[in-house]
Design a protein with these regions (language model features):
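Short beta-strand-loop/turn "lid" adjacent to the catalytic site in phosphate-handling enzymes
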Residues: 63-125
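N-terminal phosphate-binding or glycine-rich loops at protein starts, especially the Walker A/P-loop
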Residues: 2-43
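Glycine-rich phosphate-binding loop and adjoining helix at the ATP-binding site
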Residues: 99-157
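Short glycine-aspartate micro-motif
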Residues: 9-13, 99-104, 170-174, 197
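General structural feature for long, well-ordered alpha-helical segments within catalytic domains
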Residues: 8, 78-85, 124, 155, ...
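Glycine-rich phosphate-binding loop plus the immediately following alpha-helix
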Residues: 19-21, 26, 38-54, 130-131, ...
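Glycine-rich nucleotide/cofactor/substrate-binding loop typically near the N-terminus or early
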Residues: 27-84
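Short, Lys/Arg-enriched, disordered terminal segments
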Residues: 1-7, 32-33, 91-92, 98-99, ...
């Protein structure tokens, strides 16, 4: 067996709820070995969250939109916030920046329309790479969309390798801004291409919007508000 080099990777994620930046560190050979490091969350200010959401749009002319001054300004601010969050994270966890081999920078999705052949995440990866002096990988969804895919969800590959040594049938339910499911059987099938994974529908993004609009809260902490209601048995 070939011993693959292990890399220390720092990942940045800003989901469709547009509430902040998630940061995590892993040590991995990219295939069979994953060691999870520290992780943390850095919320957007209410004003910046509002600015981000103001540029969400499913259908748009990308050539024109990418030249819009307002979007460029928000992208620059967003990139700066990621840089600031990384520095806070590294300092808090006493991690030497020179130990980080690569940064995965998802960016903030502001337009996702695979049927029209695009998914657009703002975030200037070149600027971030120059600020950090670390290699930055971005545009994770682009190639899949250009080849007829949906560009989502992203997490199934990670789910597969994270549980590779658990010889069971496994289903992940990821309740993010958009919920998604990942299903595979490690008992009989070790083929990454046979993962069943798909977006299941809106989740926290719509709940957060409703809670903010009606109750002026950021989110339904611990599901306290939801527990006061009742569910529709026919739908369930």
């Amino acid at each position: 067996m070939i011993n693959l080099k292990k890399f220390i990777a720092l990942g940045l994620m800003s989901g469709t709820s547009a509430d902040g930046i998630d940061i995590g560190v892993i040590k991995t050979d990219g295939k069979s070995k994953i060691n999870l490091g520290p992780s943390d969350y850095y919320p957007y200010s209410p004003s910046f969250k509002k600015r981000i959401k103001s540029i969400f749009k499913k259908k748009r002319d990308l050539r024109k939109s990418k030249k819009e001054k307002r979007i460029i300004e928000i992208e620059n601010k967003f990139t700066d916030l990621n840089f600031i969050a990384i520095n806070k994270f590294l300092k808090k966890n006493k991690i030497n920046k020179k130990k980080i081999d690569v940064v995965g920078f998802h960016g903030q999705t502001i337009s996702h329309n695979p049927s029209s052949g695009y998914s657009w995440q703002i975030g200037d990866s070149m600027k971030l790479a120059n600020l950090l002096n670390i290699k930055v990988v971005s545009d994770f969804r682009e190639n899949d969309v250009k080849n007829g895919g949906q560009g989502a969800p992203l997490t199934p590959i990670f789910h597969f390798y994270l549980t590779k040594n658990i010889k069971k049938t496994i289903c992940f339910v990821n309740l993010g801004g958009i919920s998604n499911l990942t299903y595979f059987d490690h008992r009989s099938n070790r083929d990454l291409k046979k993962i069943i994974a798909f977006d299941a529908g809106p989740c926290c993004s719509l709940i957060d919007d409703w809670v903010y609009k009606n109750l002026n809260k950021k989110y339904d902490r611990d599901g306290i508000i939801a527990r006061t209601g009742s569910f529709d048995k026919k739908i369930i």
